[in-house]
Amino acid sequence: MLTASNTKAPEQTKVIVGMSGGVDSSVSAYLLKEQGYQVEGLFMKNWEEDDTDEYCAASQDLEDAQAICDKLDIKLHTINFATEYWDNVFEYFLAEYKAGRTPNPDIMCNKEIKFKAFLEFACEDLGADYIATGHYVQRELRDNSWKMIRGLDNNKDQSYFLYTLDEAQLAHTLFPVGHIEKPEVRAIAEKAGLITHNKKDSTGICFIGERKFKDFLGQYLPAQPGIIESAEGVAVGHHDGLMYHTLGQRKGLRIGGLADAGEEPWYVVEKDLLRNVLIVGQGHNHPRLFSKGLIANQLHWVDRKALTSSIQCTVKTRYRQEDVSCTVTPITDSATEEYQIDFTEQQSSVTPGQSVVFYKDDVCLGGGIIDTLIR
């Protein structure tokens, strides 16, 4: 159980930093140590990889995290959250793909592992006052409540991935690099002699690493090959499984050499689950790529106050997208909590299973899962 937010001086305040072996968490630990906090690190193992797996960098990440903690003269704890990860993140990931949707496991990992399992373990078992992570996001106390604020570095802002956090979690979390731009973070690391200063940022889904996504997913879900049809209903190719494709996808469709097809590239515009057919259209302005709105469910508001009437705000339907103005309206006749989002301008490649995240200026209000599109 989380207690009231800490008011002790830094030297009396214990902070457990989630150490990933990357530069952002390294600098987070360094800055907190410089500010006088009692700092310890914690490395989470969330995936039971095959020891012979040449693609997995977990052991190198642990080695780097240990080297940073040794350099800073702080203790490094390690913990295995693989069971929690499998039950709460990976099974969700598989279920969504099986349902023909495109999930974002990083958001679920933040919700279930980093800001639930890790936060509870740090506070309850290690006696922490706070946890800290290397996320590019800020928190601010406004009107006596904690708000999630976009990271200063607009190119690295990670509030999109953290919309499930609530005020209690924000009250117990520090984001030491949220007010710093990425190049400066690397400069701080280099000046401090941290070996991660030039380490490449991790990309892709954590449990897949550098492996090919198609090969990995095929180990867990049986592929169901089928036909690719044009939006006009003409067969134009074959797919290896709908789960390997997402709306707006252009690459890897293997469509070509069709008479009278023209030169414009093909894009995925829909997935027909009942017929196991992938539907494609030509050109990035194909009308079936666009939506004027969406229905979202599984909503999380940072203040945990559900809407009772419409609001005007801005929204992102994918990471690093420019904000889009919209109206958010609760659907009162729905059996589950659902919201209708109407864009002021039509949006391309909005994808069911991905997250829609709401903003008011620099404040992240919350978000939810895209369920259906309004065209």
From Swiss-Prot:
<keyword id="KW-0808">Transferase</keyword>
<keyword id="KW-0820">tRNA-binding</keyword>
<feature type="binding site">
    <location>
        <position position="134"/>
    </location>
    <ligand>
        <name>ATP</name>
    </ligand>
</feature>
<keyword id="KW-0819">tRNA processing</keyword>
<dbReference type="GO" id="GO:0103016">
    <property type="term" value="F:tRNA-uridine 2-sulfurtransferase activity"/>
</dbReference>
<dbReference type="InterPro" id="IPR014729">
    <property type="entry name" value="Rossmann-like_a/b/a_fold"/>
</dbReference>
<dbReference type="InterPro" id="IPR046884">
    <property type="entry name" value="MnmA-like_central"/>
</dbReference>
<feature type="site" description="Interaction with tRNA">
    <location>
        <position position="135"/>
    </location>
</feature>
<feature type="region of interest" description="Interaction with tRNA">
    <location>
        <begin position="318"/>
        <end position="319"/>
    </location>
</feature>
<feature type="active site" description="Nucleophile">
    <location>
        <position position="109"/>
    </location>
</feature>
<keyword id="KW-0963">Cytoplasm</keyword>
<feature type="region of interest" description="Interaction with tRNA">
    <location>
        <begin position="156"/>
        <end position="158"/>
    </location>
</feature>
<keyword id="KW-0694">RNA-binding</keyword>
<keyword id="KW-0547">Nucleotide-binding</keyword>
<feature type="active site" description="Cysteine persulfide intermediate">
    <location>
        <position position="206"/>
    </location>
</feature>
<dbReference type="InterPro" id="IPR046885">
    <property type="entry name" value="MnmA-like_C"/>
</dbReference>
<dbReference type="Pfam" id="PF20258">
    <property type="entry name" value="tRNA_Me_trans_C"/>
</dbReference>
<feature type="region of interest" description="Interaction with target base in tRNA">
    <location>
        <begin position="104"/>
        <end position="106"/>
    </location>
</feature>
<dbReference type="GO" id="GO:0000049">
    <property type="term" value="F:tRNA binding"/>
</dbReference>
<dbReference type="InterPro" id="IPR023382">
    <property type="entry name" value="MnmA-like_central_sf"/>
</dbReference>
<dbReference type="Pfam" id="PF20259">
    <property type="entry name" value="tRNA_Me_trans_M"/>
</dbReference>
<feature type="binding site">
    <location>
        <begin position="18"/>
        <end position="25"/>
    </location>
    <ligand>
        <name>ATP</name>
    </ligand>
</feature>
<keyword id="KW-0067">ATP-binding</keyword>
<feature type="disulfide bond" description="Alternate">
    <location>
        <begin position="109"/>
        <end position="206"/>
    </location>
</feature>
<feature type="site" description="Interaction with tRNA">
    <location>
        <position position="354"/>
    </location>
</feature>
<protein>
    <recommendedName>
        <fullName>tRNA-specific 2-thiouridylase MnmA</fullName>
        <ecNumber>2.8.1.13</ecNumber>
    </recommendedName>
</protein>
<dbReference type="Pfam" id="PF03054">
    <property type="entry name" value="tRNA_Me_trans"/>
</dbReference>
<dbReference type="GO" id="GO:0002143">
    <property type="term" value="P:tRNA wobble position uridine thiolation"/>
</dbReference>
<dbReference type="GO" id="GO:0005737">
    <property type="term" value="C:cytoplasm"/>
</dbReference>
<comment type="function">
    <text>Catalyzes the 2-thiolation of uridine at the wobble position (U34) of tRNA, leading to the formation of s(2)U34.</text>
</comment>
<comment type="similarity">
    <text>Belongs to the MnmA/TRMU family.</text>
</comment>
<dbReference type="InterPro" id="IPR004506">
    <property type="entry name" value="MnmA-like"/>
</dbReference>
<keyword id="KW-1015">Disulfide bond</keyword>
<dbReference type="GO" id="GO:0005524">
    <property type="term" value="F:ATP binding"/>
</dbReference>
<feature type="binding site">
    <location>
        <position position="44"/>
    </location>
    <ligand>
        <name>ATP</name>
    </ligand>
</feature>
